[in-house]
Amino acid sequence: MSIPKTQYFEARPEVGSRPRTVRLHLADLDLQLQADRGVFGSKGVDLGTLVLLREAPLPPAEGEILDLGCGYGPIAVTLARRAPGAHVWAGDVNERAVELARANAAAAEASNVTAATPDQVPVGLRFEAIYSNPPVRVGKAPLHRLLMDWLPRLKPGAAAYLVVQRNLGSDSLAAWLAEQGFSVARLRSKKGYRVLEVRAAS
């Protein structure tokens, strides 16, 4: 039975829990992560996430970093392991995802991760970088609201790195972000995905 895509973006997924272990293999890391039904990528780390982690620049060594829409935490845990002097926020509306991200960070000895729902992130907090495999399947309007809630919280000179499948609108999203006043660059294109670098226009 397939799980509706919207399940991933609800606070409490209705689908029953069925935990499983998935592997995240990168050149510098090899991790076993706990995933579950009702959380994005539950059958294995999503290809877009892998493209982002392999192609985006390394995270800043210090400061606050956000994994927006963290799922069970593959991006957040990787960022934390790559930048042990930084503090990584793993943010998601899905409470099951947040619990998994917290557990996976602990298992990976990434004590510099805080897994949280959006309302648990301090309002005045600003980020040195944002990394995200954003939930494009929620639809344009909810996606645009999500990005406009968080991208303005970048510090001056900081960047967000978004991975979006080309056939799911990476180029139209880049154009829309530019219309909102952001500076957008297509950083990489690989395996049907684009990595976008988004900065506040100077």
PLM segments and residue spans:
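Short beta->alpha hinge that forms the Motif I/post-I loop of the SAM-binding pocket
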Residues: D92-E95, P142, Q165
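Conserved beta-strand signature within the Rossmann-like core of class I S-adenosyl-L-methionine
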Residues: G157-V164
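Conserved class I S-adenosyl-L-methionine
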Residues: Q165-F182
